[in-house]
Structure formats: C-alpha cells, structure tokens
A protein has these predicted regions:
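N-terminal intrinsically disordered, cationic/polar leader segments
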Residues: 1-204
C-alpha cells in the first residue's frame, strides 16, 4: 500500500493522519488491494464532519487513520480547515514518496434529492472552484459554510485544481454528503498509480 503520514500541531489544532492511497484491485475496483490492511478510523471531535470524511475516504478507496483535537469549544472552523490542510499535504507527499499518479478524476454522485459533482486535476496547481447553495445553513449543529473551507485547505496544500459543484438539492445534509462522496471518488481515481508523469512537460 502507498502510505504517508502527516502530523500538524498549532495553537488551535493537533492532527495526525496516516493515509493509504488506492490501487486498482483484481476486479478493476478502485481500492486497497489487501482489504484486510484497510483502516477506516476517523475522529475529529466534529461528528457530522467525521461522517462526511468517512463517506469520502470509503468511496474513494482510501485507507485512513485520522485523529484531530481542536478548539471546537470555540468553533469547528479551525478543525475543519486544518484537517483539509493535512489531507492535502498527505496527498502531495504521497506523490513525492511513491511516484506518478493518473492526475485527473471526475465523479457525479446523487444522494436522494441532491446531486454533487467533483472534478480534480492533481497536476501541482492549486485552484478551487466551489459552487454550492445549501437550502439550510446547518446540518444538525454543523455549519455547512465550513465545507468550502475544508476543500480550500485540501486544494491549496495538495496543489490540486478542484471543481466542487453542488448541482442541486433540497436537503443540506444530502448535498454535502453527495459532494464528499464525489470528491472521494474523483480523488481516488486521480491518485491511482501510473508509471510515467501525466504531463507533456515531463514534470508536474
């Protein structure tokens, strides 16, 4: 398994992540070849965010052990943003450690009334396009405006061009979940291994 570990500690958050990148399994599915080695442990202190991250990593075929302690007694913002930063850092470092990836990924995912679409280019250029209008401000106690902050942190530190598009939805929870699942599937495809660099320049 292509793995990387990242630790980030600030005055606001303390985060550790061990991330395993997906491969193509024997039956052509994006995932961990040795399923017994796959870990799905996520704890950020923000339950709804944990749920979204689990959906993202599960459907992307990743293995993940993520632990975050943040100042959630003040606000969830620092934890959500910093987790995005750490995940982006791990993805970037995984490429540096383990070699070229396929680079591009695209996924459209429905969740009942909602439809989410995510397109990624892991080509070394950070840029986020985020278009999502939530019919409610919150999903339970979670501020849905923080979804953008998460993807901004992931995109910037991962040096990934991401287009995160909430096409429509009547339920904020469903729309956010569709976006996280689509992001996982798009990232899983983009970070599959390949033998040569996916660029006419020869480098990323």
């Amino acid at each position: 398994m292509r793995e990387t570990e990242v630790t980030r500690k600030t005055n606001e958050t303390d985060i550790t992540l061990r991330l395993g990148l997906p491969d193509l399994t024997r039956d052509g599915v994006v995932g961990i070849i040795d399923e017994t080695a796959r870990v799905m442990e996520i704890y950020t202190g923000v339950p709804f965010f944990d749920h979204m991250l689990h959906a993202m990593f599960f459907h992307g075929g990743f293995s993940v052990d993520l632990r975050a302690v943040g100042d959630v007694e003040i606000d969830d913002h620092h934890t959500v943003e910093d987790v995005g930063i750490v995940i982006g850092t791990a993805l970037r470092e995984a490429v540096e450690l383990h070699g070229p990836v396929r680079r591009f990924g695209h996924s459209v995912v429905p969740m009942d009334d909602a439809l989410g679409e995510v397109v990624v280019d892991a080509g070394g250029r950070s840029y986020l396009v985020y278009q999502a209008t939530y019919p409610q401000d919150r999903a339970g106690r979670f501020d849905l405006s923080l979804v953008r902050e998460f993807f901004q942190g992931l995109s910037s530190q991962g040096r990934i061009n991401m287009h995160v598009l909430g096409r429509y939805g009547d339920n904020g929870h469903h729309l956010a979940e569709a976006l996280f699942k689509a992001a996982g599937r798009a990232l899983g495809s983009a970070f599959l291994p390949r033998e040569t660099v996916a660029s006419t320049k020869g480098v990323l």
